[in-house]
């Protein structure tokens, strides 16, 4: 899978906004690392690359920007107002939609929270969320314990099945869900 950095030349008219978002996200996530030890920014880069791969839209630059920024409110000192000022209402709104409410998760559990949230978020936000989930399942074969992998797989499939029953999905959503399920099929 190409990273957004490798896809830059394919996104020519969108570079300025996306480059600004990448620079902001890189600075915001500085010093953060994934469980595999890689720099955290590699995750938003891959999410942006998946959005680029699967989504065709006149707002693609804004979707890619939101993909880069999707964890900034949740995992850094960034606020919704910061993003709105720098990137506009659409990008800031998408990131806000993608930001988990930790108090709500504590009340109802992560699986239920994600299911409800994904059923009601905007179509654009769902594209980014599914791209995020696709990137997260890429690491599943080598992550944690076999029991954790089986639980994560079962929860993800449950969320996706519920999503398919309770929401009208676009072709883009369906393609990303298919890619997620294909990757999960590789997991024991």
Language-model segments: residues:
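Active-site helical microenvironments for divalent-metal-assisted chemistry
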Residues: 3, 7-188
């Amino acid at each position: 899978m190409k990273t957004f950095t490798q896809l830059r030349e394919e996104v020519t008219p969108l570079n300025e906004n996306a480059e600004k978002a990448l620079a902001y996200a890189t600075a915001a996530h500085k010093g953060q690392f994934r469980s595999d030890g890689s720099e955290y920014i590699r995750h938003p880069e891959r999410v942006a690359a998946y959005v680029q791969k699967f989504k065709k839209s006149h707002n693609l630059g804004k979707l890619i920007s939101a993909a880069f920024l999707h964890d900034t409110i949740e995992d850094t000192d960034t606020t919704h107002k910061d993003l709105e000022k720098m990137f506009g209402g659409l990008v800031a709104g998408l990131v806000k939609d993608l930001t988990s409410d930790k108090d709500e998760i504590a009340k109802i559990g992560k699986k239920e929270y994600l299911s409800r949230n994904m059923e009601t978020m905007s179509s654009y936000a769902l594209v980014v969320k599914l791209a995020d989930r696709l990137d997260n399942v890429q690491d599943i074969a080598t992550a944690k314990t076999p029991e954790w992998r089986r639980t994560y797989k079962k929860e993800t499939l449950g969320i996706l099945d519920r999503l398919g029953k309770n929401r009208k999905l676009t072709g883009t959503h369906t393609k990303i869900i298919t890619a997620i399920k294909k990757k999960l099929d590789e997991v024991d």
